[in-house]
Amino acid sequence: MWIDCEMTGLSLADDALIEIAVIVTDSQLHALDEGIDIIITPPEAAVEQMGDFVREMHTTSGLLEDLPHGTTLADAQAQVLEYIKRFVPEAGKAPLAGNSVGTDKSFLDRDMPELIGHLHYRIIDVSSIKELARRWYPRAYFNSPEKNGGHRALADIAESIDELRYYRSVLWPEDEGPSSAVAKEKAQLISASPTLAATSEAQDTTAKAQAAEDV
């Protein structure tokens, strides 16, 4: 369940949710529908306190001009839930997916708890994969597709799906992955040298070396 939100800023105390878009994909990242995009009219106070950077961003995208024609939070949540239930009627099945989606989820926790309650507690965050690629496979990271969503929710979430499609194509094999035997072997190697035990052993080695130098 791919979701992207636009807000008047990042403060849960002062800022408002002003746009939400949803695209549903299958497990192979094929979109099942063209998606839904809803504009939410925020309190005037949230618009007035908007910072210059965010105001310029939403002016350039056209979102600021569209805000007076939006709907309420309650209606937006009802529309999104109705849309999602067409594809995933049972609660707790579909994970929330997106890009740096923790920020979006914070606002949805506050403003659309019924929506969050319908989703699975696990999250698929493309930004996590991107950060791993930057460290482990920099060529894949630096050649990733350019993003031109323009800070509108539906375009941004479509680009997030495409971004994961790209990373899947370059970082994961097209077949079914390792055999069960290979996977079990790798798991045993990790279990034989867990992170904390390896750290403790390294510290012991360093301490012994330091003690030898002090003699």
Which functions belong to the PLM regions below?
Residues 76-80, 104, 160:
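Alpha-helical packing segments of well-folded alpha/beta enzyme cores
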